[in-house]
Amino acid sequence: QWAQEQGAKHIYGPINFTTFAANRLRLDHFERGAFPSEPWNPPYYSSILAKLGYKIRYRYLSTFSPLNDIIAAIGQDYLRVKPKLEQHFNLVAMTPEFWLANLPELYGFVDEVFGANFAYTPISFETFQAHCGESFALKFCPKTSVLATTKDGRIAGFFLVYPDYRPLMRITGEHSISAAAINYAEPY
């Protein structure tokens, strides 16, 4: 209401200062949990916003699938295109060690790739390091996360895969684990 009174015709959000932080609402699959540090909201938020007249403008996709299902769905296609990909790119496991050793290059790469996205707000390297440094790198799976580099060693792309940390996040009491403390290498 305040924004309308100020003359706003459109409001986009939520954006928590930058798109590197919480910047979206979840609309479905609440039973699936969330990735560590992924935005989370109660299921009823979307109905409140709809009643206020807000509409969905942009969507995002998070995939919650067992690894074997993903392999079955894309395995044959990947094997078919792999020889062509390997003519131009090296495909290797993305490890926390590579991530941390190449954080400045990853910062520039992420800025370049996402810079044209809606509401993208650049952040300083120091902020990137705080959001995407060691505690971030220790959460993704180094066996299934993939790094693509050009033949001369430049970062060409990557995707990160996370285990299902929901059981850990449900632990309460003295043995509870915060999202910030999750570490893939720990034998929970």
Give the label of every model feature segment.
Residues 2-93:
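Acyl-donor-binding surface of acyltransferase catalytic domains
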Residues 93-188:
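A conserved beta-strand-loop-helix scaffold within acyl/acetyltransferase catalytic domains
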Residues 1-16, 45-54, 59, 134-167:
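Internal hydrophobic scaffold segments of catalytic domains
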